[in-house]
Amino acid sequence: MGSSFGDLFRVSTFGESHGGSVGVIVEGCPPRLEIDLEKIQEELDRRRPGQSKITTPRKELDQVEILSGIANRETLGTPIAMIVRNRDQRPSDYKEMKNIFRPSHADGTYHLKYGIQAPSGGGRASARETIGRVAAGAIAKQLLQKVQNTQILAWVKRIHNIEAEIDINTIGFADIESNIVRCPNQDVAKLMIQRIEEISRDGDSCGGLIECVVRNVPAGLGMPVFDKLEADLSKALMSLPATKGFEVGSGFRGTFLKGSEHNDAFIAGDKNRLRTATNNSGGIQGGISNGEPIILRVGFKPTATIRKDQQTIDSEGKQITLASKGRHDPCVLPRAVPMVEAMVSIVLADHLLRQRGQCSLW
């Protein structure tokens, strides 16, 4: 329960942070889709731990293994199973915390719900669960690219209180990957890295904001009422670890505008295609994509695991002073960028198949 997402393009993840492996099963991917296996690995490398001085020092190769559903670099139309084996588990880091509820972790709520939790590493609540999502998202990206030349780009817009202004019309993948914090503004990126290092040296952590743009979006994706496109995007992105907020288009800033300021006037584009003069709606109106770029933002809280002393209790109610020893990111945002892209890709691939299935018979 709770480990699957999507209707037609369905993604189910499995595994724990300190178990033997983590993985994913993708169902519903159309057959005969040519798959670039290297691109799956490239996406996993982007979220891999130990990739820079501002990420967790845990060392994992995160090499993907394709178990089924792809042969000779083509999808078969059957379930695609992929796993990544865990290599650098250190359960000893958690031995002293076995019965202790770490502040703002899932330990307490998992205990309240199940009466038991994984003995080390956070179990299903660990960010290693997202390996399966990123692998599935890499396939969804290739599907969207083939059908519509759709491009999904995410980047770090804000770290703590340091924010970058980004021109979403000109930003490219190389700009995002040009530094370890994945902020396309080079000057601001340096300040962000310094801030993460300062906070980390103090044994603390920080959060921030990731922004995402989707270009060449097919019009008509999304369903009325309960399956609105932004509703599914919100569910997908808010299911990522450490997320605390979501907005699309003008978002909360739009609440300060009047209707005359916020409305996106319709204009005729090339070949008389319906366009909008502005894009406060963020490419979605009435829960359905209008063909304009989809623009969204996701807020991430500070990493819950910090080295500072914190007060908590154990399973017997005894007061404990805790200073975590596990290996964790002082800021999750640089590695969360491919996670955001993956979940957006999965949602759009699912809605693309739903749209084609319902509205393309004649």
From Swiss-Prot:
This reaction introduces a second double bond into the aromatic ring system. Homotetramer. The keyword Lipid biosynthesis does not apply. One of its GO terms (biological process) is aromatic amino acid family biosynthetic process. This is Chorismate synthase. CDD domains: Chorismate_synthase. It catalyses: 5-O-(1-carboxyvinyl)-3-phosphoshikimate = chorismate + phosphate. GO terms for cellular component: cytosol. PANTHER family: CHORISMATE SYNTHASE. Keywords: Amino-acid biosynthesis, Aromatic amino acid biosynthesis, FAD, Flavoprotein, FMN, Lyase, NADP. One of its GO terms (molecular function) is FMN binding. Reduced FMN (FMNH(2)). It holds the Pfam family Chorismate_synt. Belongs to the chorismate synthase family. HAMAP family: Chorismate_synth. FMN binds at R124, A125, S126, G286, K301, P302, T303, A304, T305, R327. Pathway: Metabolic intermediate biosynthesis; chorismate biosynthesis; chorismate from D-erythrose 4-phosphate and phosphoenolpyruvate: step 7/7. NADP(+) binds at R47.
